[in-house]
From Swiss-Prot:
Motif (Nudix box): 111-129
UniProt record, GO biological process: nucleoside phosphate metabolic process; ribose phosphate metabolic process
Broad enzyme group: hydrolase
InterPro entries assigned to the protein according to its UniProt record, in alphabetical order: NDP_pyrophosphatase (IPR004385), NUDIX_hydrolase-like_dom_sf (IPR015797), NUDIX_hydrolase_dom (IPR000086)
Record-given protein name: Uridine diphosphate glucose pyrophosphatase NUDT14
Gene Ontology terms, MF aspect: ADP-ribose diphosphatase activity; identical protein binding; metal ion binding; UDP-sugar diphosphatase activity
Gene label: NUDT14
Function comment: Hydrolyzes UDP-glucose to glucose 1-phosphate and UMP and ADP-ribose to ribose 5-phosphate and AMP. The physiological substrate is probably UDP-glucose. Poor activity on other substrates such as ADP-glucose, CDP-glucose, GDP-glucose and GDP-mannose.
Subunit details: Homodimer.
Domain of life: Eukaryota
Record keywords, A-Z: Cytoplasm, Hydrolase, Magnesium
Species this chain originates from: Bos taurus (Bovine)
PROSITE patterns cross-referenced by the UniProt entry: NUDIX (PS51462)
Main location: cytoplasm
Amino acid sequence: MERIEGVAVGRCAASPYLVPLTLHYRQNGAQKSWDFMKTHDSVTILMFNSSRRSLVLVKQFRPAVYAGEVERLFPGSLAAAEQDRPQALQAALPGSAGVTYELCAGLLDQPGLSLEEVACKEAWEECGYRLAPSDLRRVTSYKSGVGLTGSSQTMFYAEVTDAQRGSPGGGLAEEGELIEVVHLPLDGARTFADDPDVPKTLGVIFGISWFFSCVAPGLGLQ
């Protein structure tokens, strides 16, 4: 996963995942504009494996995180994107700079599937757990990337067991996914969430906090 080679950066051509746009509007009599990205809404799934007394997370390399770290440590590195062709990054970092811990998640990019159906599909593809929509508890929905995408994300919760795991998961190779499933023991989950040196999404932090506040007491877990 962390073996990253031949890193180059270039302009984004036509993409099925995002479209850069500018919204022009008048607010309180003042003409304004705002650049944003049109993208898909998404779902996330927080799973608790009662067989292992652990929370199920995923770990994967995120190119955007990697590029952001390169630019943060070596300002101006992404200026190569102004070129017509992808240009090799002169300042590169180990692949670990782009690896993050996340909740199982997926885009709502398949018309006809409900939020619950997409969540179940992702739980199987990424983590290898068989879920039915009836297994899911809807936690909440919220806006993400409010300054850039304004997309909506819905979080679900599901309790699973080892008996429901029918494959190792790992994502779809044909879609470029390379995912490691992580079973986070409950006794170290709070420390994990609070550690600023562990690269993780806000969804992981919120999910762990929500679990201990809303689920653990009912299961007799502390």
